[in-house]
Amino acid sequence: MLLFWCEPDYLLAMAVWSALLVVALRMLLLWRRRLKAASNEVVEARRERSGSKRSAQQTGSVVSGSVVSGSWKLKLAFSVWALVALLTSLELGFAAFVDTTDAFNATNVCHRWFRRHVDPYRNEAGFRDRRELKAGPQDDVRQIYFFGDSFTIAQGVDRLDDRFTDRVEAELNRRRGSTGKEIRVANLGEFGWDVSLIEGMVRATLEQGYRPDVLVYVYMLNDIEGYDPRTEIAIRSIQRSRSTFWLWTRTYFFNWMHFCWQQAQAGRTVDYFPHLADSYDSPVWQNVRAALQRIKERCDEHGVEFRMAFFPFLHNLGPEYPFEHAHQKLAEFCDEAGVKYLDLEPVLTPHGDEGLMVNRFDNHPNERCHALVAEAIVGQLLQDQIEKTVGEESLD
């Protein structure tokens, strides 16, 4: 149950709060019983035959006024309690049953998703992969490493087997059958990585003696943002708008709703995507191009074949896709550098109406999108790997 993945202090606070709601309800019910008893007294007073008629009327009038005053106050109190109970139910329901992500890993629901579906499955190198990396040449297998960001690590996809990297390995080995060497795919993706970080990780991986046969950089179009101050300013402005109020930071439902409100506000005030698109027509692109060239040269030095795949922004797919020029820049680099590549925009655009994103607030690819990407990678980017592994086995 998802509640067991919540923080202990949250569970304690909600237990205390729920107990207070129960106590408040009991007090309201006691109040209602007392008002009912007072109302009965009014009836009895009006029926009272002893004493003067004027005295009975005065007594009934006083008690009746008190009952009427208490009655509307009780109704108001019950209404407030019902509203608070409803909001508490929404909070507990959200905490107990909602297991998803947001685009920026900014909500408590998303943080918990990472604790459930990512952190327990990290290998010794820190990557979300069921298999450990082995340094040195691996003569008995053919290795393919995928580097990338959260699109590669598969944010929002619960099962490892549903990621495109795991699907690629399964399909390549299925097509290989009993011939050739086993093909092993390693996922070296991480949330928030850009070109500069991936360049450093590629360098460190190769210098530490890891020798994949093919290294694929799954490039996401926001990988350029670390080189452009404008996009960094836009991101910081979003981060600065985050509240420190406990109701927005220590809950699940209210935290999510606050995030949605922030996203709506940011969409009207922050020009993140326009700046990002402009980056590819500015000198910033030359810095990214140089970094890609260095990755290619580093791979060549260690006898590793470098390839690329370009991921589009899924929420922008369509006839007026604003990042078409960015894909062209990347393709031109690959053609000039002799890098085999796969542009996923033409692959995914025909399926844009099938719902390729994790959810409305997270534009990372979902399981359906990962399946399409895996099929394209096997059929267009890595279609030669089966022949190569069969050829290598015959040479051995």
Feature-to-residue mapping (PLM):
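Membrane-embedded alpha-helical segments of integral membrane proteins
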Residues: 1-33
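Membrane-interfacial, low-structure loops and terminal tails that flank and connect transmembrane helices
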Residues: 33-72
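Hydrophobic membrane-insertion alpha-helices, especially the h-region
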Residues: 78-92
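Membrane/wall-proximal cationic-aromatic binding patches
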Residues: 94-178, 348-352, 360
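Conserved SGNH/GDSL esterase-like catalytic core that processes O-acyl groups on lipids
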Residues: 145, 154-240
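Short, amphipathic alpha-helical "lid/cap" segments that border enzyme active or binding sites
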Residues: 195, 199, 285, 289, ...
